[in-house]
Amino acid sequence: MDLRAFPKMPASQLQRVVESAGSFATSLNLSGHRSLLPTTVESLTGCLSVVHGAKVTPPHNQLTYLNMSGCSMVTTSSLHHLLTQSPFLETFCVKGMPAVTNETCEILSQHCPRLLSLDLSQCKSLTGAGIRLFASSAVTRAMPLSLVELRLSGLKSITDRTMSALGEAAPYLEVLDLSYCRDLHNSAIDAFVACSEDFALDSISLTPRQAGRNPNEGRRYRRRITRLRHLSLSYCVLLTDIACSHLAHAMPQLELLELGGIGSELKDDGVVRLLETLPKLRKLDLEDANDITDNVLQSITPHPSSDDIRRDHCVPGHALEHLIVSYAIQLSNDAFLALIRNCPHLRVLEADNTRISAAAVKEFVKLARERKSPDATVVAIDCRSMNEGVVKEIADSTRPRLGWRAYEARRLAYLDGRDEDAVGVGQDECDPYRVVLKTFASWQTVDAVAAARSKRRKGWRRRDANTSSGGSTTEDALPQRSRWWSPGVRRSSGMNSPSLLETNNDRDGCTIM
């Protein structure tokens, strides 16, 4: 039952809907129901119970998916009452709920052993102690957590012991979000991947040089080989590139790495050491890393190959699709050009406020068109060389916004070449093979289209006002407008997308009869 579209549904009606599904319900999404009361939650718990109304202990439901993010009025006791009756729960999202406490983690550990996905982001009453308790319980029972996805954005008081227990208890983690954990330190990252010599699962022994330590040390360092595919450490402001060194060789399956917002503490040494061990990397976020140099881009730039089909798939950068290096002011244009030419799958490049040149942007646009990359995007805002002349030069291959055809996008008034909406300016914003170019000059095109539409609409109104009652109507004289979604009009054969221009009608929405 997906009820997120009805956040103001009365409690009586909500209970009636849930009661109709009863114990057969396996999914419940109450995201955004800010007025949901604790008494209502307790009533819903009874409705979902397999044995509700019967004197059988303990009652339980069959929920495998539960999303209560944003339910700010729910109390801790009512939430725990529901969780104690959800033994089959696999996906649990309570993002931003003040009712979530450290005790909630204990309840999850005892009553929800099948959890695969857990989102406890931005829960102000939760601290690292609760996560340590959650992980330590699994270690004590010698039963590793089944968790594949864990999101803890904004968690407070994360210690080395917390990360060590989590690393030991959750060997199957593929997605880990620790963004905005502002007291997360390098040593906690080290504790997460460190393991003893008798570690039962996959591990690797590293030399001091490989581990980013003093090469003169005589010892070796053992690291767990994790299954992580997505790691987010964005805005963990206490981290440095030393944390990257700790993670090197420990994440061979990683595809998405987010290190944005850390700033100048990210240096070349640790970042390069990590990137050289990530052959499957598809997205890299290094926003605000203003101290990195060309060495970082070179570490993810495959060597030129005359035969793209036989390109080595073990080379970092061969799978790179999305790169964010905004405000990395020390990166040279030559490094950008080499990256653009040698990363065959590069589809999104965000390089605002960098030294990227107009030539590099033109090369990206040309190669994206040749490779037929859908929805390719280049962001070059506040780049000195990207002036209005350059934008006009490549206007035939670009668009200012990533438009799409849907009723939800109607108010955004995307310019669609499939509509009979010739305004004389702008580019087709719904053509997936046009490259999205975001610059100050390209955004002016959006304003120009809006101004042209407004001017044309005013002209139509004046002509309509001057038309005599016996003459032809304005609608007959004007070209056919978009009929994709007009009140009371049957949808046409389907090629026209929504438009903000409503001829002879200033109001959007339903027509009152």
Located regions from the model:
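N-terminal adaptor-interaction module of cullin-RING ubiquitin ligase components
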Residues: 1-42, 80, 106, 132, ...
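Conserved hydrophobic beta-strand positions in leucine-rich repeat
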Residues: 1-4, 26-31, 64-69, 89-95, ...
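The feature captures the LRR N-terminal capping module
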Residues: 3-16, 21, 31, 43-54, ...
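Leucine-rich repeat
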Residues: 9, 36, 42, 72-75, ...
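Glycine/serine-rich loop-strand microenvironments at binding/catalytic pocket rims
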Residues: 15-30, 105-118, 166-176, 274-284, ...
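Ankyrin-repeat helical core positions
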Residues: 18-19, 45, 49, 83-84, ...
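Inter-repeat linker/turn residues at the boundaries of leucine-rich repeats
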Residues: 23, 34, 58-61, 69-72, ...
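C-terminal capping region of solenoid repeat domains
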Residues: 161, 179, 186-260, 265-513
